[in-house]
Structure formats: structure tokens, C-alpha cells
């Protein structure tokens, strides 16, 4: 039981330290992250669509 409490205490300490180091992103950083995420989603969708089209053409739908 003491080991579990020590592990929880250590986790809390490390999490708190990481939280204090982080900062809220500014608007430009947020927009850049949103654009990159959106482009990634679109790219994955296009790849999936191309795989589906190739599958339909090869297997005959």
C-alpha cells in the first residue's frame, strides 16, 4: 500500500511540474496546429478514397 501511495505521490509531483512548465498557446500557434490537423485529416481521407477506388477498379466493385 505504501508503494502505491509513493507512486501516486511521484506521479502527482511530475504532473504538476509538467503543468507549471507548459503555457497556453497564442492564437497564431493555435491556428497553425488547427491547419496542420485539418490537412492531415484531409490527406488521410484522400488516401482512403484512392485505396477504395483502386479496390473497386481491381475487384470490379
UniProtKB/Swiss-Prot annotation:
InterPro entries the record matches: Prot_translocase_SecE_dom_sf, Translocase_Sec61-g, Translocase_SecE/Sec61-g
GO cellular component: a single term: plasma membrane
One annotated GO biological process: protein targeting
SUPFAM superfamilies: Preprotein translocase SecE subunit (SSF103456)
Localization of this protein: Cell membrane
Keywords: Cell membrane, Membrane, Protein transport, Translocation, Transmembrane, Transmembrane helix, Transport
Single GO molecular function: protein transmembrane transporter activity
Transmembrane segments: 35-55
Keyword NAD: no
Protein role: Essential subunit of the protein translocation channel SecYEG. Clamps together the 2 halves of SecY. May contact the channel plug during translocation.
Family recorded in the similarity comment: Belongs to the SecE/SEC61-gamma family.
Subunit structure: Component of the Sec protein translocase complex. Heterotrimer consisting of alpha (SecY), beta (SecG) and gamma (SecE) subunits. The heterotrimers can form oligomers, although 1 heterotrimer is thought to be able to translocate proteins. Interacts with the ribosome. May interact with SecDF, and other proteins may be involved.
Annotated protein name in UniProt: Protein translocase subunit SecE
Organism of this sequence: Pyrococcus furiosus (strain ATCC 43587 / DSM 3638 / JCM 8422 / Vc1)
Amino acid at each position: 500500500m505504501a508503494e502505491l501511495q509513493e507512486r501516486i505521490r511521484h506521479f502527482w509531483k511530475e504532473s504538476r511540474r509538467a503543468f507549471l512548465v507548459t503555457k497556453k498557446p497564442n492564437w497564431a500557434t493555435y491556428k497553425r496546429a488547427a491547419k496542420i490537423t485539418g490537412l492531415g485529416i484531409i490527406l488521410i481521407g484522400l488516401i482512403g478514397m484512392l485505396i477504395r477506388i483502386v479496390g473497386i477498379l481491381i475487384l470490379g466493385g
